[in-house]
Amino acid sequence: MSKAGASLATCYGPVSADVMAKAENIRLLILDVDGVLSDGLIYMGNNGEELKAFNVRDGYGIRCALTSDIEVAIITGRKAKLVEDRCATLGITHLYQGQSNKLIAFSDLLEKLAIAPENVAYVGDDLIDWPVMEKVGLSVAVADAHPLLIPRADYVTRIAGGRGAVREVCDLLLLAQGKLDEAKGQSI
């Protein structure tokens, strides 16, 4: 890359050379759900059914990452059938729901995939995510993350959770690895 403190212009704005260097080595992207893949709102129906909105652009970014040899996993504190369904649609096979201590699932993923922590990126939005974020090679907070999480992250997205933040991270990883052009024309 370039000198420390330098940055690279991207379609999302300038990104530090340090972040790009970290992104270049990522082989596993771990995502939270509420506040990252969704906007954090939960809609409750009269019969107790739970609904969330997922951004199609995030889905496209995930598919591009998966087809570019970047594994994608979900670790979430809540449990919902609709998250299972969304993961199945996108081809995400590593799903950990109902995780009050996300470090347990993180350790399981590292062992199962034989990946070192420095080759992992984690995208979170709240304090439950911080224990994992401080262990990974690239920690990312979404733009509307908890105020205490933002200064601790290596990278803060320009886009809010549930609005394309995951796509921004996927594009960043693919750009750093020289694979972004391969994503053109793919279908989800």
Swiss-Prot record:
Keywords: Hydrolase, Lipopolysaccharide biosynthesis, Magnesium, Metal-binding. Substrate binds at residues 34, 55-59, 63, 78, 86, 102. It catalyses: 3-deoxy-alpha-D-manno-2-octulosonate-8-phosphate + H2O = 3-deoxy-alpha-D-manno-oct-2-ulosonate + phosphate. It comes from the Bacteria. GO terms for biological process: lipopolysaccharide biosynthetic process. Catalyzes the hydrolysis of 3-deoxy-D-manno-octulosonate 8-phosphate (KDO 8-P) to 3-deoxy-D-manno-octulosonate (KDO) and inorganic phosphate. This is 3-deoxy-D-manno-octulosonate 8-phosphate phosphatase KdsC. It comes from Escherichia coli O6:H1 (strain CFT073 / ATCC 700928 / UPEC). The gene is kdsC.
